């Protein structure tokens, strides 16, 4: 009887440790809104060029997207 109580206690303790490690602080990311660049001309090949144009338009970032490779500027909503 003592052995089974020790075993149950040990298993319960290990389960609690396992569950507690999965319950850390959760980070929440802001949604990202995208709009097509008004000043970018031509096919978007380089994300760096797109991002530079978007910075000039007042956006914090930008990248090339889609089949037609258009430049989209991004910001947090």
UniProtKB/Swiss-Prot annotation:
Keywords, sorted A to Z: Antimicrobial, Disulfide bond, Fungicide, Plant defense, Secreted, Signal
InterPro entries cross-referenced by the UniProt entry: Defensin_plant (IPR008176), Scorpion_toxin-like (IPR003614), Scorpion_toxin-like_sf (IPR036574)
Tissue: Expressed in roots, siliques and seeds.
GO CC aspect terms: extracellular region
Annotated localization: Secreted
GO biological process: defense response; defense response to fungus; killing of cells of another organism
Membrane-traversing stretches: none
Keyword Phosphoprotein: no
Disulfide-bond pairs as recorded: 33-77, 44-64, 50-71, 54-73
Family annotation (Pfam families): Gamma-thionin (PF00304)
Signal peptide region: 1-30
Free-text function comment from the UniProt entry: Confers broad-spectrum resistance to pathogens.
UniProt family annotation: Belongs to the DEFL family.
Protein name (database record): Defensin-like protein 4
Taxonomic classification: Eukaryota, Viridiplantae, Streptophyta, Embryophyta, Tracheophyta
